[in-house]
Amino acid sequence: MSFIDEAKVYLKAGKGGDGCSSFRREKFIEFGGPDGGNGGNGGSIIFIASHHVNTLIYFKYKQHIKAENGHPGLSKNKFGLSGRDITIEVPIGTQIYDEEGTLITDLNSENQKFIVAQGGKGGIGNSRYKTSTNRAPRYFTLGEQGEEKWIILKLKIISDVGIIGLPNAGKSSFLASCTNSKTKIANYPFTTLEPELGVAFINNTELVLADIPGLISGAHLGYGIGDKFLKHIERCSILLHIIDCTLEDIIDSYKCIRKELSLYSKALTEKTEFILLNKCDLLDKEEISIKKRLLAEHTKKEIFTSSIKKSKQHILSILIKHINKDCSINKPFIYDPFNT
């Protein structure tokens, strides 16, 4: 399935049904009086955040959405049927903008609803205009037009841990080894072309990890493919920075990613970061020790190591402990597309 995280959609809510102008006509009743009913309301278009979807691909094939009009009122004081609402599920983390780019709402929690296009109100039938001085009104009102607009949808993935690093650092391999993600893995840059989600379970605790496609120098300006996905890092609670230990200059590798984060948004550099030296099975212990020490001196942070054979449980447990310590983080439920 294609990963679509932006879409432009035309919405037209239903028009309200017209009110009815009619009079009661029955045998032996000479002056039956007005009995025109109200028109039904037009259908609205509603978006609801759901873990059942994780991409905006629905809008790739459905770019024009129109709700049903309300039915006109009828005689005998019968109200017209209201148009059916259209309710569309969107991924948790979907932001809705108007055409000018102004944020309308942010659907960032499960089952959060928002009426994006309101249906028009039904018209009033002539029976409602009857008064003591006007016993036989003939006038009625037309139904109101429903809202009509273009909107822009943008998806920012919500996850506990955002996995970042240069292309081919082993991010996808790490995700696949500790979760049930079936992401594509190969020994060349930009294997991952779209964010991948995986769910790890440590001591019955769920940890959602997002593999962000590899960033390169200049990603914030559009180089490589990272600029399309830097926004997804904003919704991650913490960052796991994976570095290929076989690189000659691991400090430069680290600084490259940190620079791109700061140039995109200073807030990204303020997120808690854990550093993982990957592919340690390709070097001897002395080389790993030297690189680990150099990186620790530069970053002033604890450096973790990983290899194909080494269990990932230790680093995952540390990540979960850190997230659980922060009571301000409201852990969302994220759909795992491979656990169905």
Curated annotation (Swiss-Prot):
Which residues does the annotation say bind GTP? 165-172, 190-194, 211-214, 278-281, 306-308
Where does this protein hold Mg(2+)? S172, T192
Cofactor (UniProt): Mg(2+)
The cross-references to InterPro entries, in alphabetical order and at most eight, read: G_OBG, GTP-bd, GTP-bd_Obg/CgtA, GTP1_OBG_dom, GTP1_OBG_dom_sf, OBG_GTPase, P-loop_NTPase
Report the top EC class in one word: hydrolase
Enzyme Commission number: 3.6.5.-
Q: Chief localization class? A: cytoplasm
Q: Name one Pfam family in it.
A: GTP1_OBG
User: Which molecular function term from Gene Ontology is one that the record holds?
Assistant: magnesium ion binding
- The Obg domain covers 1-158
What biological process terms from GO does the record include?
A: ribosome biogenesis
Per its database record, what is this protein's job?
A: An essential GTPase which binds GTP, GDP and possibly (p)ppGpp with moderate affinity, with high nucleotide exchange rates and a fairly low GTP hydrolysis rate. Plays a role in control of the cell cycle, stress response, ribosome biogenesis and in those bacteria that undergo differentiation, in morphogenesis control.
Q: Subunit details for this protein?
A: Monomer.
The UniProt similarity line reads:
Belongs to the TRAFAC class OBG-HflX-like GTPase superfamily. OBG GTPase family.
PANTHER family attached to this UniProt entry: DEVELOPMENTALLY REGULATED GTP-BINDING PROTEIN-RELATED, MITOCHONDRIAL RIBOSOME-ASSOCIATED GTPASE 2
Q: What is this protein called?
A: GTPase Obg
Q: Which organism is it from?
A: Ehrlichia ruminantium (strain Gardel)
Which classification does the entry list for the species?
A: Bacteria, Pseudomonadati, Pseudomonadota, Alphaproteobacteria, Rickettsiales
